[in-house]
Each structure stands twice: as structure tokens, then as C-alpha cells.
Amino acid sequence: MFQRIRTYCLSGIQAIPVSVEVDSSPGLPGFTLVGLPDSAVRESRERVVSAVRSIGKVVTGFRTTVNLSPADLRKEGASLDLPLAIGLLLASGEISVREPSRFVFLGELSLDGLLKPIHGVLSVAMTLKNEREAVLVIPKENVKEASLVENLKVLGVSSLAECVNALIDDSFSGGALSAPGLHRKSLELNYDSPDFADVVGMEGVKRALEIAAAGGHNFLLIGSPGAGKTLCARCLPGILPEMSDEEILES
């Protein structure tokens, strides 16, 4: 049986969509993984098989081929463990899920089926923000990060067993969080920045910094220790406009 599971890989800080294509068929048992996987991805088979066994399922009695598409993109990291496990369970007929294309899976599995936090969840969440029906399934430790993207459906799970039960029961709608987005009050600085009004003299430096702030220009302060470079630089945020939500997320 053939199954396609949605996930993402990172290229720098950019999230690239990846399809985990799993084909399990009768024949001499074997497992082939293609699609430019790195060492961590190639080793995922052992983690996934052990994690699947821990929840009482078996996916090893088939001739299995896994393709990570696009095939010309190098896949790195252990975040493909969860989508690979779900793909194997579906392709082998161990579980059945309604409309699996709704879900995007990310997560590293331990041998006992527990999910470990991963990197790059925010980049993936920002990519999915315009997909109203998409449900991002991630480790619970990453839910707070993903919830910074407003109105994204996020399902946090702590183990493979919890993920499978939610998918089988189609109970994700009750457990999925509709992300509230940014709360600016939680991002406010906890210290008082100095103000340009408190800086005596140095009119030329202040004027240059005001021009740099207004036009978004770079600047370089050079001078002897104690000349006021650090003080002026610390005053600069006070005259900058507030960042938009998108700018905050990108920073």
C-alpha cells in the first residue's frame, strides 16, 4: 500500500516542504530509504521500528521503500522520525486515518516512542499560516513556539502512542490548539533604556543615529573608551518604530 505524509526540512532558516512517500508490499522483507538522507535520517529506521514496536504495532514484515521527495534536496536531522513512523503504520495497514494530507508531522522519536523537541518549528509554522485546514503535529515542548503564528492549528503530542490514538479517534479537533499569535505585552523589555534626551552634547552623533534610524541605514561608531558609543547605541531603540508581527517572528 502506498502512502504520502507531509513534513518539512530546513534549508538554513527556510522551511522546505517534503513528502515522505512509503510503499509497503508483500515480498521478501526489506527496507530501502532514498532521497538524499543524511546519517541521522538513515538511522531513523531503527528508532522508528523500535518506537512502533513499543505501541504494539509491527511494520517489518513487508518489502518497504521510502522516498523523501524532492529527491534532489538533502534531508537533515531527526525531525523526520514521526512522519516516517506514521507513513509506515498507514502503508502497512496497522492504522487508518481520515484525510492524512491535512496533517504535517514533525518530531524525533526515542526508542520507547516518546517524542523529543526539535528545531525549526517556527519556520514551518510561518510557512503553514495560510493553510486553513492544515494541522501541525509536533512534540508538546514545541507547541509554545508554533503558537506564535496566529490561527494555526497545532496538535502537541508527547509520544507516538498519543499521536496514533488522536489520529485514529479523529479527536485532534478537540486537542488541537488554534494558535493565539503574538502577545506584545510578553515581549516588552524588562529594563529601562536610556533616552537621547538624557545625553548631553554629542549632537553630531545623535543626528547621525537619527538619520540611520529613519532610513534604515547601517552605522559604525568609532572612538576611545568612555566617549559614549555604547550609551548612544543603547538609546537608539527608543526612537525606532515598533516592529510588525511579521518582523518580530522573522527576527
Please provide the spans of the model-predicted regions.
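Peripheral, non-AAA+ core regions of ATP-driven protein-machinery
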Residues: 1-234
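Beta-strand segments within the central parallel beta-sheet cores of soluble alpha/beta enzyme folds
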Residues: 64, 249-251
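Post-Walker A helix-loop "phosphate-sensing" segment adjacent to the P-loop in P-loop NTPases
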Residues: 238-249
